Amino acid sequence: MTKKVFDDISRLALKALLYEVSLSPKPGLVDQLDNGAHDDMSFLTFVDSALALAPFFKTYLDIGFYHAKEDPGLIFERLRVSGIEAEQAMFSATKGVNTHKGVNFSLALLLGATGMYLASQPQLLAHVTAFTEEDSLAICQLVKPLTAHLLETDFGSLDLKKELTYGEKLFLDYGIKGPRGEASEGYPTIAHKALPFLRKSLRSTDQETAQLQLLVYLMSIVEDGNLIHRGGIKAWQRVKQDMRLLHNSALSATDLKAALSAYNDKLIQQHLSPGGTADLLVLSLYFAFLENQL
């Protein structure tokens, strides 16, 4: 039974990746209509990448489930090792293009946490779509102990480093913690903002429109390192403001798609891509599938 449930959950993680790239139109992002602000990847690149990562999803679950009683730091290291192997498979499939590196990090943590949670909730092994809102929140909270050391390890001695990554520079200059910060705080954007928003939207509109509405909402609130990297702080703040206006406009499904298509043209011209938002959309969809919301 455990194997079947883990296979099912792994498929939901893959499904989340495929739904995200298929959702169209997405401003600045790769989708079925165009490559957004990217000239080195396409829709099929993302499909290849997702399929390359998929075999590792069950490994992440296994690590969390079978090592649930270990020190969380040790579980994290096990997940990190497998995550690096998955990343190498991704780069091999995409010929060196970084399609899913960030979201692979988050999926490793959340699938590992899902495995840990299932070890303490055996009744859920009977039916994969029996997860509740409380289960999703508990899984997000389990990431906290897994990543308790992460900010200190990665950001604690930056003053001693000669060369900094862009994420490290963002932390030093603006205090932006990026995916590490989101993980270390138990994915509050997912648990307390994205999922409640998506659940509410799904009660009043169709699945595709609800996902597009979620994309707009996330773009209006997320600290998106990809946007900042490409355009700077002001460009990111401008996109957030534009999306806040779109979010508050309550457009029909048809008008929303038209507005997103027009904004896609704008971001392509500015070479801006909200990749951080796309990652959080994937994670939101994963939990929506677990809860059988989608």
From Swiss-Prot:
Keyword Nucleotide-binding in annotation:
yes
One Pfam annotation, family name? CitG
Q: Which residues form a coiled coil?
A: none
What keywords are assigned to this protein? Answer: ATP-binding, Nucleotide-binding, Transferase
InterPro entries referenced in this protein's UniProt entry, alphabetically: CitG, TriPribosyl-deP-CoA_syn_CitG
- GO biological process assignments: prosthetic group biosynthetic process
What reactions does this protein catalyze? 3'-dephospho-CoA + ATP = 2'-(5''-triphospho-alpha-D-ribosyl)-3'-dephospho-CoA + adenine
- Keyword Kinase in annotation: no
Question: Could you state a single Gene Ontology molecular function term?
Answer: ATP binding
The organism's superkingdom is given as: Bacteria
Q: Which EC number(s) are documented for this chain?
A: 2.4.2.52
Which HAMAP family does this entry report, sorted A to Z? CitG
Question: What family is it from?
Answer: Belongs to the CitG/MdcB family.
Protein name according to UniProt:
Probable 2-(5''-triphosphoribosyl)-3'-dephosphocoenzyme-A synthase
What organism does the UniProt record list as the source?
Streptococcus equi subsp. zooepidemicus (strain MGCS10565)
